Amino acid sequence: GKNRLIVPGGYVEPGETPQQALKREYMEETGIVVEPKELIGIRFNQKDWYVAFSADYVSGHAVSDHNENSEVLWLDIDEALTREDVPDLTKKLIQCALHKENGFVQIPYDGTRRYGEYSFYGIPL
C-alpha cells in the first residue's frame, strides 16, 4: 500500500511454483536475484494464500520498478521491527525467520499428480 514498506511479492503464475514466483517477483520489482530457502510463514483465508520464504541474496543492484514501488530500501532487522510504516505481518514474518530453528524446510518428496509435482515442507526429523 501507499506509504508502507512491504517486501516484494505477487501472484503465482500458471505453471509456476511459489519459489519460482518469489524469484520472478523480486527480479521484476527490485532487480535483485534471490534464492528461496525455508518456508517461514503462511497466511490464508478462503480467498487467498500468502506464502513467505526466507531467501538468500544472489546478485543484482536494487532499483525501483517505478510501478509497484517508489523505491527499494535495505533495512536492518531492528529498524524493520520498530518502524511504524512496516506492516505487522512483515514484522511477524521477520520474527519467524529469526526463530526458524524449529521451522519448516523443504523435504524431498517423490510425488507427481494430475496438477504437477508436489513440494513438501515440514519440520526436520
Describe each model-derived feature in a short phrase.
Residues 97-125:
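Charged phosphate-binding loop/patch that engages nucleotide di/tri-phosphates or the phosphate backbone
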Residues 1-3, 60, 70, 111:
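Glycine-centered flexibility motif
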Residues 12-36, 45-97, 120-125:
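Unchanged
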Residues 41-43:
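Short beta-strand micro-motifs within the conserved protein kinase catalytic domain, predominantly
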Residues 1-7, 33-34, 38:
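N-terminal strand-loop-strand
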